[in-house]
């Protein structure tokens, strides 16, 4: 396995993250339930729950010292408690441990918040450093295209049996 990194490892979103590992991705569950249906929404939830568990398992199995800890995650509003309540209802219907609250760990008051229990936080750069020590990484290698097992980069092409995209923004349309 190799990693192609367009810049330097950890220089993008990883360095500027909130360090939360969470199934909370803005107000998505009510909309997803309504627009995509319950089955697809449940699949989305399931994938996110598996990812959360994978982080925990990887940290334990590889003994990665990255300050990994279980904690709650909050999504809040300063103006619309009803929207937050609808999101909580959808999340609970989809099997997520979530509750409406006005109490958070934030240093300011909110009109409403979703508390997602059993989420996690960690030091992402320590985590990434431990992973990077076990991988072959080509930094400053921008992927410009992918076609059926062939990856095009600004430094040449790579053949691959499988390709995983792990970027903050899509690298192509």
Language-model region placement:
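Glycine-rich active-site loop/strand segments that organize a redox cofactor
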Residues: 12, 16-47
């Amino acid at each position: 396995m190799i990693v192609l990194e367009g810049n330097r490892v950890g220089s993008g979103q990883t360095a500027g993250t909130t360090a939360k590992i969470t199934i909370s991705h803005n107000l998505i569950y009510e909309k997803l339930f309504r627009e995509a249906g319950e089955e697809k929404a449940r699949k989305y939830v399931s994938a996110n729950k598996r990812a959360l568990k994978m982080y925990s398992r990887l940290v334990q199995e590889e003994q990665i010292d990255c300050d990994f800890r279980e904690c709650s995650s909050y999504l809040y509003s300063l103006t619309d408690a009803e929207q937050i309540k609808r999101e909580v209802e959808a999340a609970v219907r989809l099997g997520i441990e979530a509750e409406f609250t006005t109490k958070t760990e934030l240093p300011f008051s909110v009109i409403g918040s979703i508390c997602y229990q059993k989420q996690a936080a960690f030091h992402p750069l320590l985590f990434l450093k431990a992973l990077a020590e076990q991988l072959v990484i080509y930094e400053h290698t921008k992927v410009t295209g992918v076609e059926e097992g062939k990856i095009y980069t600004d430094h040449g092409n790579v053949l691959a049996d499988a390709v995983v995209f792990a970027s903050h923004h899509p690298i192509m349309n």
